[in-house]
Amino acid sequence: QLLLVGRFFQAAAVELGHKNFHTFSVGFDDGGYFSELPFARQVAEHVGAQYHEVVIDQKQFIDTLPDVVYASDEPLADLSLVPLLALSRLARKDVKVVLSGEGSDEILAGYDFDRSERDYARARFLKGFPNNALKIGAAFSRLGLSEGLQRKAEKVANVPLGDWNRIELPHITSHFNQGEKEKLWPNEGHQNSERIIAEQYAAAKSTDPLQQMLSVYQQSWLVEDLLMKADKSTMAASLEARTPFLDYRMVEWANRQQNNVKVKRVGFNNYETKSVLRRFCERRLPNEIINRPKRGFPSPGNHWMQNGLDGWARETLLSSEGKLGEVFSREEMEGSIEQARLGKGDSGDRVWMLIILEMWLQVWDVSLLL
């Protein structure tokens, strides 16, 4: 027996296989954007699978964090580990082996790779203008662009095409830039995270920006986050996880394909991600499943931080028993928590990274003091 979560390509796998399947889904009691349970029920009903679900509230989420930190072995600050562990525990009651869709986005260009391809096409277009014209705001005004689009166009116009990817994926390394690291942990050496990604770009065999991005995602995000958390969460529940999209033959085939097989232009300014997979599924699944916007595996952690959880974050990070406070700037951590409460930028992600690191130090009784 197998587990498949409710994305359209996995629903297609059930459709093509036998009907003795269990499907499992996890959601949050906040509902709305953070719960895909109605969609998961629709998929299960369509394919005739046995459906199971689990709902997590804020207290269960917080109470599960130490288990997640312990199961991860290392400080892996991805909050989707919590619902993944809950899902794995639910599935283990009925199955021993699970199938997961990790890798499909990284080899077939899911996520926002349509936006990346579109923006790169715009950059090529803008490069056709003389540089002096690109730097004149009046030229953009005559084109009818908004002030925001003018600023973006000017930025794009002044980035060499060969360096395009450097402005596209800074989040793949860390939510802390070098300056923020130095403020948080002053008077210490810091690993330059951007250099790691720059080296992976330089090592990419293709000179095409989309192919380069996919290569970097396959080497970093896929290996160091997605597969890590899938492996840790399922092992913690005594499950065996398999990833059919990462069969070496599938990966090699996908990496040989042209861009338009993965990201297809479907209008003047619209692109379709994972196009080849959608074509395969459209004869087998309803359009509302195939064309539903991708959400990934969202967690309401940042939403909760803006709605009362900031007090718990302060207690966790700033108490006298805290280990991070031994070396990290308490002022900077306090500032990040306040920014997270206000929903500013990616400050919520930074706070959760600090919380996971603090919990990891506590669970494994590690001190940052030498």
Annotate the PLM regions.
Residues 85-148, 227-250:
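Active-site adenylate/phosphate-handling loop in enzymes that bind or generate adenylated species
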Residues 35-37, 65-66, 109-114, 304:
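Short aromatic-enriched loop/helix-cap "lid" or pocket-rim segments at secondary-structure transitions
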Residues 52, 74-77, 119-127, 260-267:
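Short, polar/flexible loop-turn hinges at active-site or ligand-entry regions and domain interfaces
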Residues 2-86, 90-93, 97:
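Cysteine-dependent PTP/DSP-like catalytic domain, specifically the C-terminal lobe
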Residues 16, 46, 105, 114-117, ...:
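Phosphate/oxyanion-binding loops and surfaces in catalytic or ligand/nucleic-acid-binding neighborhoods
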Residues 4, 8, 13, 126, ...:
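Extreme N-terminus nucleophile/cap motif
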Residues 25-27, 55, 102, 237-238, ...:
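Active-site proximal loops enriched in glycine and acidic residues that flank catalytic Cys/His/Asp
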Residues 49, 80, 93, 97-99, ...:
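Adenosyl-5′-phosphate
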